[in-house]
Amino acid sequence: MDTRGGTRPSGPLRGAPGHVVRRLHQAYAAAWTRHVDPVLTGPQFAVLMAADDFPEIDQGSIAARVALDRSTMADVCRRLEDRGLIRRVTAPGDGRRKLLYLTEHGSEVLTTVGERVRRLHEEMLAGDDTNAFLERLNGLVERWDSLADGASA
């Protein structure tokens, strides 16, 4: 998928952070589809990783860990469950909570896709100071989140 739209933006768009971030995400999503998996999405991969890292964690807690809202998380979990990658079990004593478990197939997919993700990230960040770059991106996320939550600009 060509995400470039034919030309590079000029003038004010090149200096508009929201536009640049959207373009970066478009390019990342296109690279993910081509080099990682055309069906499994980044958010789905994040949920699989969290389910693997935190066995028997509930769906709401994973949503918070991977920064997904409740309705998106419910859709992601339904899709993963439909593909046999996770199973959801009602928590004992609390019928509203769903515990997530990675299935054997989910574990296999996580291993395979995880290797592709690692290679993609190595290629994307080749030559860059990866740690400094990710620190800066995470700092921007925190700052922009605080602005979205009502902090003064």
What are these regions (language model features)?
Residues 1-39, 131, 144-147, 153:
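N-terminal leader segment of winged-helix/HTH proteins
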Residues 15-30, 62-63, 98, 102, ...:
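Extended, non-catalytic scaffold segments that flank or surround catalytic motifs
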Residues 22, 49, 64, 111, ...:
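A cross-family signal for key residues in well-ordered alpha-helices
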Residues 24, 28-31, 66, 109, ...:
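Alpha-helical linker/hinge and terminal dimerization helices associated
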Residues 26-72, 153:
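N-terminal helix-turn-helix DNA-binding core of bacterial DNA-binding proteins
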Residues 56, 78-135:
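Charged, amphipathic alpha-helical coiled-coil/dimerization segments
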Residues 75:
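DNA-binding alpha-helical recognition surfaces that contact promoter or target DNA
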